[in-house]
Amino acid sequence: LLYQVSTAGLAADHVAHPVRGVLNKKGIKFRMGSPISVDHKNKSIKLDSSETLDFDHLVVALGSATNDFGIPGVAEHGLGMKNVHEAIAIRAEIMRRFEDLCRFEDDTRLSIAVVGGGPTGVEMAGALAELKRGPLKNDLASAAEHIDIYLIEAGPRILPMFSEKLSARAESDLHKLGVFVRTNTAVREIQSRKIILKEGEPIPAEVTVWAAGVKGEPTAGLLNLPIVGSRIDTDENLEVNHYPNIWAIGDINGSKNADGRFYPMVAPVAMQQGKWVAKQILRKAAGQPLQPFKYRDKGSMATIGRHKAVVEVGKFRMTGPLAWYAWLWLHLFYLLGGRNKIGTIADWTWNYLT
């Protein structure tokens, strides 16, 4: 839901929840800090707070970081969307640029580009279009009409993990919202106020949102564990290869599925792996053999705009208002904290009615 924070659809404190507040109820001690090193011989981990924690089992769940694929200018001119702070930064930049646009009475335009045609990029582009058609138009229609929104995807279609039919439907919905969708468009460099392509004319972009992909969190390199790609090398049981009692889950996990591919970096995988590792630790404690992890794919969904979404569960596919309501319900269900749920419902209701 971070993209809704960045487009002023949700308040930041409605999508974030204090970790300590959740864990205290389970009798779990929480420490905030970044790992500096792991002493594998003595089974201890040192944090940047100078605290050293001993362990019998270590579960590494560092998550992921924005992947710039070595493209020049992404770090300097692109805005990532991996946490609440980055989402707020995007919102502030868009609003600042819009206020600048309001001062002009000529044909000056504001171009906002989203790079990456996966679910994050598609949802971000759709939310920007809704922001333009709603709050910004109500604020100053003449300025809102001068906003251009681009969605740039290097591959042949957006939402490649969905069926071709649903990808086409999502692209059609974005077109109806006024988004310029550019597929088969690879980025060579991000510069100030424009995007340089490998082929074709540059795309103007006063604001560039980078949603082209993620990689394993680089902090994992400090743990002296085997790395494959950008992830921790992990066996089928989710245990780090050659390091008994050390586990890796979520985006940092480097185990592979039956097809020999890494598991997708999505929340359902992390949630299932977290529960699985808990069971594995209990199995070890009871002297039972470990069981290989098997991911249960429960489907994919993406929202494009109001009453516009796509859902795919196996061969079942759904689009339009029903898919949109299903998306709302599912995301509301997984939000932590009753206050967050109530606040999110209030934000969504207000946005829907206004």
Where are these regions (language model features)?
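FAD-binding core/adjacent interface of flavoenzyme oxidoreductases
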Residues: 27-113, 142, 209
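Short glycine-rich anion-binding loops that position phosphate/pyrophosphate groups of nucleotides
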Residues: 63-66, 125, 214-216
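FAD-site-proximal beta/loop scaffold in flavoenzymes
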Residues: 76-103, 193-196, 202-272, 276-279
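N-terminal Rossmann-fold NAD(P) dinucleotide-binding loop
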Residues: 121
